Every structure is written in structure tokens, then in C-alpha cells.
């Protein structure tokens, strides 16, 4: 996938998404806290102004390079959880990386036509969006190593299933898109994480061979806004 192809998705939007455009703004105050320990997939103990509290983490990934004792995080008050606060972002490589996966589809909706269906049932799965003759699945990415963004950071049977469903849809004549949101701006290209989930990697490359379009968009947290930085390509390998 070359740079010109990576811009196609913005061109089908009801408006052109320029680099530097704010795709989400937090209305809640963001507080600095420090990680003490991760209790389980969705619960983290932090210290806020010297007080130990439990906060919600809405990201099932391993996040070992982001959620570890002593690391700086941003938290905000949220509703609908057992805890008062949720982790919004974690600090790494001189920047904050947004971790809340509830925001992914909100952000993705900025890049597609205004008329669309959400959570469309396909086989035994649900695909995030459908518009016109196109099905679009969204994946959030937070792992970057040596300027390469990787997904997933933990084995994902659900992710593999989504790719299989997209391939079946393409065989029926539909268009299929995988939109990857890299929630940081220090990556130059993207690869599926073969080391962590080799089965997902195989499905990823096989799906591309069958016509799946992949778009990778990067973002930055600036103040209380998530800002679109730009697109990055797939890294060059013997499979691209």
C-alpha cells in the first residue's frame, strides 16, 4: 500500500479530514496519576495526589510498556463503571498514548460518510460500520517498537474472526476495509504482530491478497484533544 492509496478513505468522507484536525475533545478534567499495579484486565491501582484509588482501564491489551508500576497516566471521571475514574492515556516515549477503546468508533466515524449503520451483524460477528457497499472494521493500536506500530499486543481470536468475516463479505461482492487507529504519533509504518499472534498475521496478509483495504491513521493527544496526525503505510516486507 503506497502513500496515495492510504489517503483514499479520507476522500470518501463528507468532508476532508486535514492533518491537525481534532477528532475528539475531552470535556472532563484530566488528572495526572501514577500506576501502582494492574489488578486485572480492566482494573488498575494508581496514586492520585498521594491517595491510592482503583481506576477502570477500558483496553484489554497487555499494555506492558504502558501500564507498569511508577508510570504516569492521565485519568478522568467517567460514568457506568464501578470506579469513579478511568484511565485515559499513559506516558511513553515523551508523549501520552490514548488507551480508552470506547473512543475508537467515535473517532472512526469522522472518516466515513455521515449515513452509515453501526455494529452490523455478519455471521457470528458484528462489524463496526457499513456504508454504501462497504463494511469497515476498526482496530485500535497502542504498541510501537522501533517506529513500527504493531497490532495486536495480545492474541485476539475476535480480531481473527473479524478478518474471516470480511473475507467472506468480499467474496459476496462487498468492499471491506480495516481501519487501524494508532493512538500515538511515533510510528512510521505498521505491521501485524506476528510474534504475539501469528494466526492473526496470516489472516491479515491473506485478507489483503483477497482485496481487503487497510488504512492506518495516527493520532496525538494535545491538551484535552485527540488530533489526527496523518496516515502511515504498511511496512515493506516480502508480503507487501
From Swiss-Prot:
CDD domains membership: SfsA-like
Source domain of life: Archaea
InterPro entries: SfsA, SfsA_C, SfsA_N
GO molecular function, one term: DNA binding
UniProt-listed Gene3D superfamilies: 2.40.50.580, 3.40.1350.60
One Pfam match: SfsA
Family: Belongs to the SfsA family.
Protein's UniProt name: Sugar fermentation stimulation protein homolog
